[in-house]
């Protein structure tokens, strides 16, 4: 069996691995990076344009990022954190555009699409107004607008207001400089750039079949791979491995045997979209409009009506409709969930299952929805919606985190988490939303945990501050810094109105 060496091995050909590869390459071009993807091409799973919402998640419109506390107060800290993290992504993307203007055009992966939150009924309007008041007072959200005026709302979202009854009353907030991001296109841009360098290697149609320490603790990792076309096998020896393979990252993390993986499990959730086939309707809507999830629904099923810009062409999607699945990837196996059950996480899985039985029941019910039932959900957004204008399509899978919880055996978490070996030689990304939008901040966290000495060096610090001007400072606490950074990114990425 052939054996090769790589300083950095990345499992998965999506936005996370591509972002980490680009960061590492910019920080130390001499490092040899190997990316492994089991499908014929990169960005075919969750990073693919129709496999995710494409929302530049900035906390502007996603109401699940501003929950109530037990006393009914609206909490905005999570929205502030996500907004600041998205600003980090915008800075890095701006740096890449400025560094390679001949080959990277902002509109090829990011476009301005206003972000709106819309609710109906007095109770939900009161919640949205309280949310707006708190967010508007913070400099990161100072440009947010509010309206209950019918004409203003018709200007903001004409398709949604057409044919709408006066009751229930509707209200909305709007941020003009919201973004739609094609993470599949961005992934391909990053990898295309990396492939021009001799120290980067991409292996497609290649599956990881084993992962272990080459010669025991403190030694490089041995990543055994198999080409799915030729059946040829080889071993990649690498001092650092990143597992960014979506839901399958959990399987690989478990196979690594690191102590930190104990207790972790996964709860897969499927997704479906209704995609508009009527160009006249598509032209009438230019926004991402989010509302509140139904009672008992998971956060990733918050309904939204989205303008998408895919390959330069506007599209209109509604959803997602969440459902129960046992697959961890869109191209995965029905046995993915079963294969993830281990003695060390059995208690976590039982606890999470017991405490989330209503959620499981909800997801199973969603799977069996008819087209007419899905259309009923859409009609809350578009009163005159016609079934013949919309076609069902499958989105990517989301594997939510299950982990140990002393009080409940196990708990289900919505979000992302980095699980890393104590010595920093291996890291895995688990979970889902906000995911791709905060990929740069997340991958910087990986570098800080796994390359601590290099990240503190003057050389890397200087490079990081060139790529990300706010690095090491707080956009949440520094209004002047935030304003400066936002002017720079909105101008560079052509997101200003």
Curated annotation (Swiss-Prot):
Q: Which GO molecular function annotations are given, in alphabetical order?
A: 2-hydroxyglutarate dehydrogenase activity; L-malate dehydrogenase (quinone) activity
Show the catalytic activity.
Answer: (S)-malate + a quinone = a quinol + oxaloacetate
Annotated Pfam families: Mqo
Record has Transmembrane as a keyword? no
Q: Which InterPro entries match?
A: FAD/NAD-bd_sf, MQO
Q: What is its EC number?
A: 1.1.5.4
* Alphabetical keyword list: FAD, Flavoprotein, Oxidoreductase, Tricarboxylic acid cycle
Q: Which cofactor does it need?
A: FAD
Task: Please name the pathway.
Answer: Carbohydrate metabolism; tricarboxylic acid cycle; oxaloacetate from (S)-malate (quinone route): step 1/1
Q: Name one GO biological process term.
A: tricarboxylic acid cycle
Q: Which domain of life is it from?
A: Bacteria
Q: Which family does it belong to?
A: Belongs to the MQO family.
Report the protein name in the record: Probable malate:quinone oxidoreductase
Native source organism of the sequence:
Tolumonas auensis (strain DSM 9187 / NBRC 110442 / TA 4)
